[in-house]
Design a protein with these regions (language model features):
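Metal-dependent phosphohydrolase cores
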Residues: 1-192
Length: 192
């Protein structure tokens, strides 16, 4: 148990360093510092140690074993960079809400960092995009515009094989084109 505690602590701390580096490039300094601090809380830490494998998220392992995870319920309710945080109207099946720019961008930084932490030297931006494509967009409770933003960002990183699109000028542009609805202007003909 002590060995798994150390291994889990090392993995989440490594992940946190990668998130910080990605957030630094995205100019989300404070978010990089405070990212996922709840993972060190007893509620999240001890369950994650119990289900730690080193190759898969302990939360996913716990969900497979039990159908749910107390650590995940705790985590997603305290960290707005998770799309699950942005679901409301549960009495009617749940309505995914559009994630604000900074939360959506931190989520992208988080996804990349998870790949970097788990895949280590085998990590590529292409493998991360392949992971993203394996998610069925019709089955995840993510707002369609947030989904488009994440898809554009991860696809761009995959093509360019770097994370330069995290820089604010590009990331804000991709967010804008993902979330702005086209304006249809109706022009009335002049009566003669």
């Amino acid at each position: 148990m002590l060995k798994k505690s150390f291994q889990h602590f090392k993995l989440i701390s490594t992940h946190k360093v990668y998130v910080f580096k990605n957030c630094f490039k995205a100019r989300l300094f404070w978010r990089g510092i405070k990212h996922d601090l709840s993972k060190y809380s007893p509620t999240e830490f001890f369950e994650s140690v119990k289900y730690f494998t080193g190759t898969d998220s302990p939360i996913n392992v716990c969900k497979k074993a039990n159908g749910w995870s107390k650590a995940w319920m705790h985590h997603k309710g305290r960290n707005s960079h998770h799309y699950e945080y942005w679901v409301d109207n549960f009495d009617n099946g749940g309505t995914p809400l559009l994630m604000p720019y900074k939360d959506a961008l931190e989520m992208v930084c988080d996804y990349i960092a998870a790949g970097q932490a788990y895949q280590k030297k085998e990590f590529t931006y292409a493998s991360e995009y392949k992971w993203w494509q394996s998610k069925d967009k019709n089955k995840i409770a993510m707002h369609p515009d947030t989904y488009k933003f994440v898809d554009i960002m991860l696809k761009t990183m995959s093509v360019e094989e770097n994370n330069d699109c995290l820089r604010p000028i590009r990331a804000k542009h991709y967010y804008k084109i993902s979330t702005v609805k086209p304006v249809i202007k109706v022009v009335k003909k002049k009566e003669e």
